[in-house]
Amino acid sequence: MFVWKDEFELGIDKIDNEHRKLFEIANKGYELLKNEFYVDKYDKIMDIIVELKEYAEFHFSEEEDYLASIGYKKLFTHKLEHDSFIKKVESFNIKEIDYDQDKYIQEMLDFVVTWIKEHILEKDREYID
Protein backbone atom coordinates (compact mmCIF):
# COMPACT_ATOMS: atom_id res chain seq x y z
CA MET A 1 0.00 0.00 0.00
CA PHE A 2 1.27 3.42 -0.91
CA VAL A 3 0.61 5.97 1.77
CA TRP A 4 0.24 9.69 1.23
CA LYS A 5 2.57 11.56 3.58
CA ASP A 6 2.49 15.16 4.73
CA GLU A 7 5.85 15.73 3.07
CA PHE A 8 4.11 15.40 -0.32
CA GLU A 9 1.89 18.40 0.44
CA LEU A 10 2.73 21.45 -1.64
CA GLY A 11 0.10 23.67 -0.06
CA ILE A 12 -1.84 24.06 -3.30
CA ASP A 13 -5.10 22.20 -2.70
CA LYS A 14 -5.95 21.46 -6.33
CA ILE A 15 -2.51 20.02 -7.10
CA ASP A 16 -2.25 18.16 -3.78
CA ASN A 17 -5.64 16.53 -4.43
CA GLU A 18 -4.55 15.51 -7.93
CA HIS A 19 -1.33 14.04 -6.53
CA ARG A 20 -3.40 12.06 -4.01
CA LYS A 21 -5.49 10.72 -6.89
CA LEU A 22 -2.31 9.45 -8.60
CA PHE A 23 -1.49 7.57 -5.39
CA GLU A 24 -5.03 6.15 -5.35
CA ILE A 25 -4.57 4.81 -8.87
CA ALA A 26 -1.23 3.25 -7.90
CA ASN A 27 -2.95 1.66 -4.91
CA LYS A 28 -5.42 -0.02 -7.26
CA GLY A 29 -2.40 -1.79 -8.73
CA TYR A 30 -1.19 -2.73 -5.28
CA GLU A 31 -4.61 -4.10 -4.33
CA LEU A 32 -4.67 -6.11 -7.55
CA LEU A 33 -1.20 -7.46 -6.83
CA LYS A 34 -2.31 -8.68 -3.40
CA ASN A 35 -5.63 -10.09 -4.66
CA GLU A 36 -5.33 -13.86 -5.02
CA PHE A 37 -8.87 -14.33 -6.32
CA TYR A 38 -8.08 -13.19 -9.86
CA VAL A 39 -6.56 -15.93 -11.96
CA ASP A 40 -6.12 -13.64 -14.95
CA LYS A 41 -5.43 -10.00 -14.10
CA TYR A 42 -4.78 -8.81 -17.67
CA ASP A 43 -7.94 -6.72 -18.09
CA LYS A 44 -7.56 -5.16 -14.65
CA ILE A 45 -3.92 -4.30 -15.35
CA MET A 46 -4.90 -2.66 -18.63
CA ASP A 47 -7.64 -0.68 -16.87
CA ILE A 48 -5.11 0.65 -14.37
CA ILE A 49 -2.61 1.58 -17.10
CA VAL A 50 -5.29 3.45 -19.06
CA GLU A 51 -6.58 5.23 -15.96
CA LEU A 52 -3.05 6.15 -14.91
CA LYS A 53 -2.16 7.57 -18.31
CA GLU A 54 -5.40 9.51 -18.71
CA TYR A 55 -5.33 10.95 -15.22
CA ALA A 56 -1.63 11.81 -15.42
CA GLU A 57 -2.26 13.67 -18.69
CA PHE A 58 -5.11 15.59 -17.04
CA HIS A 59 -3.05 16.40 -13.95
CA PHE A 60 0.04 17.41 -15.90
CA SER A 61 -2.03 19.75 -18.05
CA GLU A 62 -3.59 21.32 -14.95
CA GLU A 63 -0.22 21.67 -13.24
CA GLU A 64 1.40 23.16 -16.33
CA ASP A 65 -1.44 25.68 -16.64
CA TYR A 66 -0.86 26.66 -13.02
CA LEU A 67 2.88 27.00 -13.59
CA ALA A 68 2.25 29.20 -16.63
CA SER A 69 -0.13 31.37 -14.58
CA ILE A 70 2.56 32.07 -11.98
CA GLY A 71 5.24 32.65 -14.62
CA TYR A 72 7.35 29.67 -13.54
CA LYS A 73 10.66 29.98 -15.37
CA LYS A 74 11.35 26.22 -15.52
CA LEU A 75 7.98 25.35 -17.06
CA PHE A 76 9.52 23.91 -20.23
CA THR A 77 11.83 21.51 -18.38
CA HIS A 78 9.02 20.62 -15.98
CA LYS A 79 6.82 19.77 -18.96
CA LEU A 80 9.60 17.56 -20.35
CA GLU A 81 9.56 15.60 -17.08
CA HIS A 82 5.82 15.10 -17.47
CA ASP A 83 6.21 14.07 -21.11
CA SER A 84 8.84 11.48 -20.18
CA PHE A 85 6.47 9.93 -17.64
CA ILE A 86 3.68 9.64 -20.22
CA LYS A 87 6.08 8.11 -22.77
CA LYS A 88 7.22 5.57 -20.20
CA VAL A 89 3.64 4.61 -19.35
CA GLU A 90 2.86 4.31 -23.07
CA SER A 91 5.91 2.09 -23.50
CA PHE A 92 4.83 -0.47 -20.89
CA ASN A 93 5.15 -3.69 -22.84
CA ILE A 94 1.69 -5.20 -22.60
CA LYS A 95 2.93 -8.37 -24.30
CA GLU A 96 4.88 -9.13 -21.12
CA ILE A 97 1.80 -9.01 -18.89
CA ASP A 98 0.88 -12.64 -19.47
CA TYR A 99 4.33 -14.03 -18.65
CA ASP A 100 4.13 -13.10 -14.97
CA GLN A 101 1.28 -10.76 -14.16
CA ASP A 102 2.24 -10.10 -10.56
CA LYS A 103 5.84 -9.34 -11.50
CA TYR A 104 4.58 -7.00 -14.22
CA ILE A 105 2.33 -5.16 -11.75
CA GLN A 106 5.18 -4.87 -9.23
CA GLU A 107 7.61 -3.46 -11.79
CA MET A 108 5.00 -1.01 -13.06
CA LEU A 109 4.23 0.12 -9.50
CA ASP A 110 7.91 0.46 -8.62
CA PHE A 111 8.39 2.85 -11.53
CA VAL A 112 5.17 4.82 -11.03
CA VAL A 113 5.42 5.32 -7.28
CA THR A 114 9.14 6.12 -7.33
CA TRP A 115 8.65 8.62 -10.16
CA ILE A 116 5.68 10.33 -8.50
CA LYS A 117 7.40 10.59 -5.11
CA GLU A 118 10.65 11.91 -6.57
CA HIS A 119 8.85 14.31 -8.90
CA ILE A 120 6.74 15.79 -6.10
CA LEU A 121 9.59 16.02 -3.60
CA GLU A 122 12.16 17.39 -6.03
CA LYS A 123 10.68 18.97 -9.16
CA ASP A 124 7.31 20.15 -7.85
CA ARG A 125 8.86 21.45 -4.66
CA GLU A 126 10.99 23.82 -6.79
CA TYR A 127 8.00 25.89 -7.86
CA ILE A 128 6.77 26.50 -4.33
CA ASP A 129 10.16 27.35 -2.80
From Swiss-Prot:
Fe cation 1 binds at H19, H59, E63, D124. CDD domains: Hemerythrin (cd12107). The keyword Transport applies. Fe cation 2 binds at E63, H78, H82, H119, D124. PANTHER family: BACTERIOHEMERYTHRIN. SUPFAM superfamilies: Hemerythrin-like (SSF47188). Keywords: Iron, Metal-binding, Oxygen transport, Transport. It comes from Clostridium acetobutylicum (strain ATCC 824 / DSM 792 / JCM 1419 / IAM 19013 / LMG 5710 / NBRC 13948 / NRRL B-527 / VKM B-1787 / 2291 / W). Gene3D superfamilies: Hemerythrin-like. This is Bacteriohemerythrin. HAMAP family: Hemerythrin (MF_00556). It comes from the Bacteria. Monomer. Oxygen-binding protein. May be involved in a storage mechanism or for delivery to oxygen-requiring enzymes. The oxygen-binding site contains two iron atoms. PROSITE patterns: HEMERYTHRINS. It holds the Pfam family Hemerythrin. One of its GO terms (molecular function) is iron ion binding. Belongs to the hemerythrin family.
